[in-house]
Design a protein with these regions (language model features):
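Extended repeat-based scaffolds of very large eukaryotic assembly and lipid-transport proteins
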Residues: 1-142
């Protein structure tokens, strides 16, 4: 992978924030039945996670959610160009957080038909090859 771009850095920052929020849910869940304050802490952690999740994953200043991002991949607008670069960066990094696998696979499929630049196509092909190898290794190890 080439040097981390601004988009890569934002995805990594979001990944860390999502993991912290998700971890907070788990740590407060274990104590939620202890008393009312613990229950409220757990509720607050859940609410905070759900309120921020979409904005962190999709960088809400650019996309309103998964469907918006997927829809923009085929557009020939400035937003479409940015969406394709965001999607390529996302699958290059393969961030690990709640529901990332669904989005990863969906972007992998949708980018196959998107109008990519030569650089993006080259990066996509490398990712696709690595994914095929990963799947093959999983099948052989089962």
């Amino acid at each position: 992978m080439k040097k981390l771009t601004f988009i890569h850095q934002n995805i990594l920052k979001s990944e860390a924030k999502i993991q912290r929020l998700h971890h907070l849910i788990g740590s407060t869940f274990a104590k939620r039945d202890d008393n009312k304050q613990s229950y409220e802490s757990w509720q607050s952690a859940c609410a905070n996670f759900h309120q921020n999740y979409s904005a962190l994953v999709f960088h809400s200043d650019n996309f309103e959610g998964e469907e918006n991002l997927i829809g923009l991949l085929a557009h020939d607008s400035a937003n479409g160009v940015y969406a394709r670069e965001f999607a390529i960066c996302f699958i290059e990094l393969r961030p690990y957080y709640f529901r990332f696998g669904y989005l990863y696979k969906r972007l992998l499929r949708k980018l196959k038909h998107a109008p990519l630049t030569q650089d993006q196509l080259s990066r996509y092909d490398k990712i696709k090859q690595a994914y095929r190898q990963y799947r093959q290794n999983r099948i052989n190890n089962d």
